[in-house]
Amino acid sequence: MADITDIKTILYTEKTLGLQEQGVVVIQTSPKMTKNGLKEVLREYFGVTPLRVNSLRMDGKVKRFKGRVGVRNDFKKFYVKLPDGVSLENGEA
């Protein structure tokens, strides 16, 4: 079962702010989160039923630090279409 702790952040970039005008919110989560799990979390904790959820898996970037190679954590991004007049500003519906 998905949990609210699997949601890392709501992304705020130029691209996502443009999408918010169309009612789409971009959420970054742990890789184990599923579409149905995210819908369940949004209904339970925010009281919002999304119209559509699209997901994509992002591999962690390879980065160098002090001569050593490391890898950042993998994550999933979800594009969530919300009903008109509903937003998730500041983590609240």
Curated annotation (Swiss-Prot):
**Which GO biological process entries does UniProt record here?**
translation
Q: Which GO terms describe its molecular function?
A: rRNA binding; structural constituent of ribosome
Alphabetized UniProt keyword annotations:
Ribonucleoprotein, Ribosomal protein, RNA-binding, rRNA-binding
What is an example of a Pfam family matching this protein? Ribosomal_L23
- A cellular component term (GO) from this record? ribonucleoprotein complex
InterPro entries (alphabetical): Nucleotide-bd_a/b_plait_sf, Ribosomal_uL23-like, Ribosomal_uL23/eL15/eS24_sf
Question: Subunit structure, briefly?
Answer: Part of the 50S ribosomal subunit. Contacts protein L29, and trigger factor when it is bound to the ribosome.
Spell out the family assignment given in the record's similarity comment: Belongs to the universal ribosomal protein uL23 family.
The record describes the protein's role as: One of the early assembly proteins it binds 23S rRNA. One of the proteins that surrounds the polypeptide exit tunnel on the outside of the ribosome. Forms the main docking site for trigger factor binding to the ribosome.
Record protein name field: Large ribosomal subunit protein uL23
Q: Which organism is it from?
A: Campylobacter fetus subsp. fetus (strain 82-40)
